[in-house]
Amino acid sequence: MKRIILSRKGFDSKAGGTASPIFSDGKLVSIPIPQASPSPKKYKDLDFDGITGTQLLKEVSAKVSPNDYCHNDPLLNESIGIFGQAGSAQTELKNRGVGPGDLFLFFGWFKNFSNNGNDIHHLFGWLQIEKILEGTSKIKKYLKEKNIEHPHGYGDTSRFTNNAIYVAKNNLEVLGQKFKAKGHGLFKQTHQKLVLTEENRSRSRWKLPSRYFKNSDSLFLNRMKWQNKNACTIFYKGFGQEFILDVETNPSVKKWALGIIKKHG
């Protein structure tokens, strides 16, 4: 594992227009963004351990209709974990050396609507890469063989330039050591250890655990940077999707990621 990618997914201010929900019992579900063209799923078709897509939209008072198509990606609650990427974001991942063994940590905008909670950035899932399939023909062939429907291999995919999917390992693995934790999955309950946002700050103000991040060296490989390195705070700017961390030279950050997966995954 040389790279950890903090990957922003789910409803945002432009796509969906509201946060994904944290329910009163602590469950959280990332709502996929809308997709204008036909995709494998409409919102009414979604089911996250008994919580339907229609319930999700109602919980957050979304303007999206249950009959609208959604971009249901990444797939983290299925037997095979898959994440699709394309365009400039995929180019960035490739150019920064993201490959097999590396780990995506997915985060998004969440809020507990039942108690008018704060807007926060919260981790909701992970995927460790087993292999990368590039090009629509390879993607469609693989998905057909596995009987999987995924937006990046469904119907007309011409809008996905530089199309790729990342397939998950069966189990989490580091330096040949396999763990009991799956190679992909969801954090299904909220926990402070999964919150990126600094307490009582706007969601764009992050504070990462100094125990793991304080002495990091040249950690950020693309647009992310420290606001205060000693305090491990970040002012999250812009709408980039993929934030790539060098954990080959910062192994303590790897310990942080593995720890939260093993404890909360």
PLM feature spans:
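Short N-terminal edge-element motif at the start of the domain
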Residues: 51-120
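Short, compositionally biased
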Residues: 114-136
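Conserved hydrophobic/aromatic beta-strand scaffold that supports enzyme active sites
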Residues: 6, 103, 124-126
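Contiguous surface segments at macromolecular interaction interfaces
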Residues: 1-50, 132-265
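Short, flexible loop/turn elements at secondary-structure junctions
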Residues: 8-13, 80, 87, 108-110, ...
